[in-house]
A protein has these predicted regions:
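A residue-level structural signature of the nucleotidyltransferase/glycosyltransferase Rossmann-like core
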Residues: 4, 25-26, 48, 82, ...
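Pocket-forming structural segment of enzyme catalytic cores
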Residues: 41-106
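A secondary-structure boundary/capping signal
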Residues: 29-31, 51, 86, 120
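Flexible gly/pro-rich beta->alpha loop and the following alpha-helix that scaffold active-site loops
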Residues: 1-28, 36-39
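Short glycine-/acidic-enriched loop or helix-start segments at secondary-structure transitions
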Residues: 3-6, 36-39, 45, 94-95, ...
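C-terminal and late-domain segments of enzyme folds
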Residues: 66, 86-141
């Protein structure tokens, strides 16, 4: 991805990995999920790769495959809005990674310690619940 190329070219990849390993809270949405995944199905690893997940890029198709749904997420009361745009999904979790949300049998949110990832874009909705969840992760270290 362009983001991974920039991280490498600017010499930031290893410092970011080190900061996450040292406990820096990080939240990756959509492409951020791809950057944090240790495995991407069918692709070599040139990413941050700090989270015990396997992701599938553009799993929901291209722009026309984008959609909105409300669904539950572990640790948040009620359903939350989820907007998917050319979104990946998590095919597999292992180690310390924990599934937080699924939509139609596909994993769309996960957590591993100080790392949170979602396949959807919470910034495109008015709900702040996922942001509050991330802040609670930081405050409850």
């Amino acid at each position: 991805t362009t983001q991974a190329k920039l991280l490498n070219e600017l010499g930031l990849m290893q410092p970011v990995k080190d900061a996450i390993a040292a406990g820096l809270p990080v939240y990756g949405t959509c492409a951020g999920l791809i950057l944090l995944a240790k495995n991407i199905e069918g692709e070599p690893s040139h990413r941050i790769a700090t989270m015990d997940i396997t992701a599938l890029r553009n799993a929901y198709g291209r722009q026309l495959g984008s959609f909105y749904i409300e669904a539950p997420m572990k640790g948040i009361e009620g359903n939350i809005p989820m907007t998917f745009i050319r979104a990946p999904y998590i095919k597999e979790v292992w180690g310390d990674a924990e599934v937080l949300a699924e939509v139609e049998g596909k994993i769309v949110a996960a957590r591993q310690g100080n790392q949170l990832v979602t396949a959807f874009h919470p910034e495109l909705n008015d709900s702040l619940e996922i942001h509050k969840y991330f802040l609670s992760m930081i405050n409850n270290k």
